[in-house]
Amino acid sequence: MLGICRGRRKFLAASLTLLCIPAITWIYLFAGSFEDGKPVSLSPLESQAHSPRYTASSQRERESLEVRVREVEEENRALRRQLSLAQGQSPAHHRGNHSKTYSMEEGTGDSENLRAGIVAGNSSECGQQPAVEKCETIHVAIVCAGYNASRDVVTLVKSVLFHRRNPLHFHLIADSIAEQILATLFQTWMVPAVRVDFYNADELKSEVSWIPNKHYSGIYGLMKLVLTKTLPANLERVIVLDTDITFATDIAELWAVFHKFKGQQVLGLVENQSDWYLGNLWKNHRPWPALGRGYNTGVILLLLDKLRKMKWEQMWRLTAERELMGMLSTSLADQDIFNAVIKQNPFLVYQLPCFWNVQLSDHTRSEQCYRDVSDLKVIHWNSPKKLRVKNKHVEFFRNLYLTFLEYDGNLLRRELFGCPSETDVNNENLQKQLSELDEDDLCYEFRRERFTVHRTHLYFLHYEFEPSADNTDVTLVAQLSMDRLQMLEAICKHWEGPISLALYLSDAEAQQFLRYAQGSEVLMSRQNVGYHIVYKEGQFYPVNLLRNVAMKHISTPYMFLSDIDFLPMYGLYEYLRKSVIQLDLANTKKAMIVPAFETLRYRLSFPKSKAELLSMLDMGTLFTFRYHVWTKGHAPTNFAKWRTATTPYQVEWEADFEPYVVVRRDCPEYDRRFVGFGWNKVAHIMELDAQEYEFTVLPNAYMIHMPHAPSFDITKFRSNKQYRICLKTLKEEFQQDMSRRYGFAALKYLTAENNS
């Protein structure tokens, strides 16, 4: 803006100079032509004829003055040439390279404004206020449905948040899946000055389901047509974006374009950058009617209030009905109908400069739109191939996209200073809890972790599960970090039932996981595995938070609380379903124990039966889990009895007991105060006992722990004395809380701890 104003000041100075120099010159000459109140002729011949006081000296002075006048006139002509040159360059300076490329094609938009600006001298804009006020809220509408689109929305939102300087209000037209995912994401993201409202896309299906559509976006690709009806009646304007958009500038610049709309202009669109609507892409290609190349609807500026007054709903419906009589279906979803309406009513559209929607489709000509990185504003991956689209600059665009794809979303939780924000009750409570902590406490970081809100993306990959008729399904629940990713395929081979996994990853690691999963035939063949990403924050591994996330998002009545390092026996899923019925788990408070074993061998011939397992146990190939370092953890399972047991048997709780159990989904959550290594499962089993769960060992079930390198947290536990001191303090506080919650019955836990 500063550069534009400087250019205009130079323009103004040149104009003033052009006007002033001749005036000053002629005033000087006019004044100098009087001597003693009488006019003096500038012509030497006339002076000689009429002035008796003519001298050789005055003759030289007048000749000198005439030379000076000719020099001034020459300077005047030079200034005129510079001024005309400045006029010719003014629009290019104002718009960058874009006006050169698309000046003829943007006749209804910026090029007209530029021509008007040249006539007006462009000087008035220097002192104007910015088109978007500092704290003005920018409204953005996005249609989103399904698991994959939810991932795309996150990348789009990151790119918008990265550049934004204004409060944002997202209006998300989402199906039930996307709403669950994105509502949790935004709630845990806790970005200041961002509001999100959801609108049920399933309720809007009837509005557009009558339109046959061949586009890969399906019925949801038509829902932008009904935004005037869907969005709040008091919302006057909105920016509508596709999910495959990436911003490279502040969205406020696009919002400011609304101020350029004139007359009946209600739609801001960029011209389509392919020949699709010209109908020459292949033989017998018959596109929907469009004005010239047509317009792309990946980025739309909608003046909702005016559209409602124009009866937009009736306008697009009549147009669609008429065209469908001949076209039979849409090929590009809502875009075909928008273009058909514009063809009949060209006055509705304000043509945006092409850099607001640089389209990377298979037949794009978008390279004509940009000549420099600074020209790019919005990138649109509008090809079914997405990042694999063919384009000579695709590597540059892909890197820009990957920047936001892998960008740490936690860094976007920055305040907009000077802008009042709506009170967030959850955030206020969080700040209050944190303020009550003593920062000088040596265990402050442990205590703080309990209140940390981790950004969470549920169902990172497609999830689908059909429950059984007998309602006995069991979900395997586990948590992991990037270093345990290799266990996923093995677990999927051993467990055919549904799985709920919480993965503790950074944004970049989440993309590595996505590539790993999409490249795995085993994982891609399974639709009943729910992957929930909990993004990294803080210095500790929030093991119990991860377990709670995985537990909370299961779709079965029962769950098997396992760990990622264990492989369940083949057929365990079906065996547990039968045991659920046998032990009447639906109507009793029981925790079914699956005995745990371990091997020290990375390559193991996995036992296919209990008999094989006992044989390997006797040969020393297998051991009871942690028998040599933490015997108390699983001793109450009574492995000696299990060897010969043929029916389930009950065991009593003992200090430090931490078996792996199958319980109903309504069991208590894990205590979040325990992070990293130590006491995280022990505390949970203690609470189950306090709630009077019966611990029943299954005689024909088993699981085997596979060897792996020590985790970072167990290394800290073993090497850091303060870590162990804080863990002991947290244990004592947990036991005190148990006493307060469960009264006299909880005293046995204090006694057991003292005796252990």
From Swiss-Prot:
Keywords, A to Z, come to: Coiled coil, Glycoprotein, Glycosyltransferase, Golgi apparatus, Manganese, Membrane, Metal-binding, Multifunctional enzyme, Signal-anchor, Transferase, Transmembrane, Transmembrane helix
Q: Where is this region: Xylosyltransferase activity?
A: 138-413
Cofactor(s) needed, names only, are:
Mn(2+)
Enumerate the InterPro entries for this protein: Glyco_trans_8 (IPR002495), Nucleotide-diphossugar_trans (IPR029044), Xyl/GlcA_transferase (IPR051292)
Region (Disordered) residue spans: 43-64, 82-108
One GO MF term: hexosyltransferase activity
One Pfam family, please name it. Glyco_transf_49
Q: Name one GO biological process term.
A: protein localization to plasma membrane
This enzyme's EC code(s): 2.4.-.-, 2.4.2.-, 2.4.1.-
Pathway(s) the chain acts in: Protein modification; protein glycosylation
**Binding residues annotated for Mn(2+) 1, in chain numbering:** D242, D244
Chain positions carrying an annotated carbohydrate? N97, N122, N148, N272
Task: Give the record's membrane topology.
Answer: Single-pass type II membrane protein
- Protein name, entry field: Xylosyl- and glucuronyltransferase LARGE1
Q: Which organism is it from?
A: Mus musculus (Mouse)
From the broadest rank down, the organism's phylogenetic lineage runs: Eukaryota, Metazoa, Chordata, Craniata, Vertebrata
